[in-house]
Amino acid sequence: MKCQLLFVATVCLASVWALPVPDEEVAIQPDSGAKAELLTKTVLPTAVEPAPLKPEAEKPAETKTIEAKAAVPEQPDVNANPSPSTPAAEPAKEINSVELKSSAPDVETAPAIPEKKTLPEEAKPAQENAPVEAEKKQEKTARTEAEPTVEAQPQATKAIEQAPEAPAANAEVQKQVVDEVKPQEPKIDAKSAEEPAIPAVVAAEKETPVPEQPARQERINEIEQKDAKKDAAVAEEPAKAAEATPTAAPEAATKSDSNIQVIAPEKKSIESSPAAAAASPAAQAAQAKSGEAPKPVDQQKSTETVAESAPVLKTNAPLAPAGATKVTEAVKEQEKEQPAADTAAKALPEQKKTEETAAPAGAPEPTAAVAPAAVPEAKKIDEAPAAETVVKGEEAIAKPIAQSPSAEPKKSSEEKSDKSESKVDESSESKESEESSESKEN
């Protein structure tokens, strides 16, 4: 066994050493015609001789049969590939077995022939495509180099265009902040009423009066509605008291006098009759006789609140010039007081008639004598202070009008103080109205 293995090894080594070294550029062909065609296509100008046949003749028969079997399947590969060596393939079929044996090593290298023939054909389109691709790449690079510059310019322009957009967004945010701060304005005014006015704040209010108009107009309307409701309630109260007097006792008549005389100064009617305007002294005299002491305090409070009602509407000052707003405020107050005064003037004669009818109806003689005695006294007292009360009412209304030109620089501080006073006055008026209604019900 060892001998056989050594023999086979030596045969293999001899066959390997006998094989020619295949060149990458030249393929050896069995025919001379094929050699001539190859020479025209190869780079080498010299003809290539076939490999020597001596070592192959010395080979044993086993290697020859193996090589012959290997050559048979490889021949169709040579014929299958189209090449100018196809006419040489026909004489190759007539070659003897010895030539096949001798060309066996050449046939092993035969697959390199079509590769060599196709390589230049493939290289040509590759070479043609290479410059085209190079041109395309150059164009792309040129475009990419040009495009960044073109893109950089719009970016620069965009950056320049976006710069003015930032203030617009800030303006919108400022508008939202102003809208959010509007409901907090009364709180700020109430707190700063105690502090001295800052001219910068006044200038800011003068510059931007438009967005503040709706809120302040609503507040003014609310105040006016409250005043109208109070006037209507005051006008209805004497009528109710007049209806209650016919069935009441003479003592009730004196109470109705006191009620009428407490209510009349709250209206402070300028155009009403002197008896209606000067009811407060008669009320004090009647209350002194009847012993009703706590009502003059309410009366004083009511007169003070009515006198202070004129500057309540000074919250309109930022909406227009100072003098015009204050004059219009006085006119509005007069217009409001006129219907209230008319209703009071109508109610007072009716109450006097009811009192006159109630006094002689079923009252005892002493009380009946007291009531007529009180009437002439009230008339005497009314004639003297009637003009004084009317003049006082006119002066109270004329004071804010006279102060309007001189009070312009002090507008902001006065407005803030007036707002706080108006709030306090409204609270005191509401408390007084509740107390008066409770006392009348009792």
UniProtKB/Swiss-Prot annotation:
Biased composition (Low complexity): 159-172, 241-255, 272-288, 357-376
Tissue: Expressed in the embryonic CNS, in sets of cells that are segmentally reiterated along the periphery of the nervous system.
Modification Phosphoserine occurs at: S430, S433, S436, S437
UniProt biased composition (Basic and acidic residues): 55-67, 114-125, 133-146, 177-194, 204-240, 329-339, 408-442
The keyword Phosphoprotein appears for this protein: yes
Job description of the protein: May play an important role during development.
Name of the featured protein: Protein bangles and beads
